[in-house]
């Protein structure tokens, strides 16, 4: 079975005010427990970016405890680890972009949302539970799905679960269950790079970054 998730941010305290946990230790413990309750060793999990915090170390102690065959599509918090090579110990592949088939459904995977209206689905992270200008745009695009743990009950989910959770998020049905979004990142966060089918895109990081591709 194939699962999707994003924006775990293990060990990252600044996100606590926007999550229902009293400490980083509790957050990490719940994320690991819910992952392993859903995923078996034979399952495949695509992590669509941001396993930790860009200026720290790879959270290997947490990643080593997660079940399944894991694949990372890097986000802006996965490119600046002091020991970035350690990611390859915990993930079978580490890429900036990926395309797969989930059964008969074609899937595009990128940390940053791509405006997409064609066959299959585009699965992203990065936005957490943000309600900025991108929210109104993406709620009109049901083929663009947010895999972030903040809108998926802090666990990896299958494609049908992801579709339903996004429907509930964009309809406002789950508003009472989702805390406010995290604070904006520090200024001057460097750059982010995402791969796309017709080449690569490089842009300065800013909250709510959306990649617009006419060829997808």
Regions found by a protein language model. Give the residues of each.
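N-terminal active-site segment of His-dependent metallophosphoesterases
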Residues: 1-59, 143, 147-152, 165, ...
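Active-site neighborhood of phospho(di)ester-bond hydrolases with catalytic His/Asp-centered motifs
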Residues: 5-6, 46-50, 70-76, 109-110, ...
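Metal-dependent catalytic neighborhoods of phosphoester/phosphodiester hydrolases
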Residues: 49-65, 79-90, 119, 133-136
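A short, structured active-site edge motif that brings together acidic residues
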Residues: 71-81, 95-100
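Conserved beta-sheet core of the metallophosphoesterase superfamily
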Residues: 87-175
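A cross-taxon signal for low-complexity, glycine/charged-rich
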Residues: 188-191, 206-208
């Amino acid at each position: 079975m194939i699962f999707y998730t994003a924006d775990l941010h293990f060990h990252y305290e600044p996100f606590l005010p926007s999550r229902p946990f009293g400490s980083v230790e509790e957050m990490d413990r719940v994320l690991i427990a819910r992952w392993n309750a859903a995923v078996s060793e034979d399952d495949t999990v695509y992590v669509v970016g941001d396993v930790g915090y860009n200026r720290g170390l790879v959270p290997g102690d947490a990643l080593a405890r997660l079940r399944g065959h894991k694949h990372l599509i890097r986000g802006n918090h996965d490119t600046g680890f002091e020991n970035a090579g350690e990611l390859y110990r915990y993930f079978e592949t580490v890429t900036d972009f990926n395309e797969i088939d989930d059964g008969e459904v074609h899937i595009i995977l990128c940390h940053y949302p791509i405006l997409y209206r064609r066959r299959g689905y585009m699965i992203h992270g990065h936005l957490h539970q943000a309600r900025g200008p991108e929210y109104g745009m993406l709620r009109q695009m049901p083929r663009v799905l947010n895999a972030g743990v903040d809108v998926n009950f802090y666990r990896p989910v299958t494609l049908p679960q992801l579709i339903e959770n996004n429907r509930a998020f964009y309809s406002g049905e789950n508003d009472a269950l989702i805390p406010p979004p995290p604070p904006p990142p520090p200024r001057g966060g460097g750059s982010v790079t995402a791969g796309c089918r017709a080449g690569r895109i490089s842009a300065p990081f800013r909250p709510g970054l959306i990649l617009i591709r006419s060829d997808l």
